[in-house]
Amino acid sequence: MIGNLNIANSNRKDTNIKFTKDQEIAVHELIEFLAQPWDDKKYINALCGAGGTGKTFVIKYVINNCKWSGGVIGCAAPTHKACRVLSNSIGGKEVNTIQSLFGFRLDVNIENFDPENPAFNPVGKDKLDGLKVLIIDEASMLNAKLVKYISNKCKKLQIKVIMLGDSSQLPPVNEKTSQAFLIASNTYYLKEVVRQGDNNPISKLLKLLREDIDNKNGWRFLDYISKNRQDYNE
């Protein structure tokens, strides 16, 4: 169990916030990651978890308490809706679409992006100047070629990257898994759902479903449903 967070920034805010064990580990390690000198082999970390485990709660704390000021921390997401949700969750900080941040023009289909085969010269002026940290939400939506492009671009500019998302969500089109989490040198998992009460039957159901997906076995989920039908009847 981690005690007080002893990190590079001694002027931490929100010192009375309580974290789950997984959240505390993620907060400590991500702030430490951002405090470390640049490393060409360790510049991408990831934070994974289902909805309600507190990914944006954790990342808001990291933004407010890491060594970098908000002006050099960029945030992005694949869709405008995801941008709005993330912005609202982290106190109104600006969040750009990946297309806008990296200078991809409107003719780019984000799901089938291929920088080696660009249609109509899609790469324009990016908005990465001065950034030291880039946080990307809904990273499971990014296909392998887009992840590679982002990785290479950020490596060239020495921008550290934190990928956020749910590794159990549907992968990008024609891919079995999202490379966004595989490319990370360290990945931190949030497993405890805190948005719903412990006695909520839906919470239990979702937990079993995720475990069956991870284990490639659907029997526990189905068995639980058959034995607890009354909990889900109207």
Regions inferred by a protein language model and the residue ranges of each:
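Conserved helicase motor core of P-loop NTPases
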Residues: 3-5, 11, 26-33, 38-45, ...
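The conserved Walker
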Residues: 51
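Conserved lysine of the Walker
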Residues: 55
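Hydrophobic positions on the alpha1 helix immediately C-terminal to the Walker A/P-loop
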Residues: 58, 62
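Loop/turn-to-beta-strand initiation segments
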Residues: 72, 130-133, 157-162
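Inter-Walker segment of RecA-like/P-loop motor cores
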Residues: 74-130
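Walker B catalytic acidic pair
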Residues: 137-138, 165-167
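Short, conserved "post-DEAD/DEAH" coupling segment immediately C-terminal to helicase motif II
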Residues: 144-159, 177-179
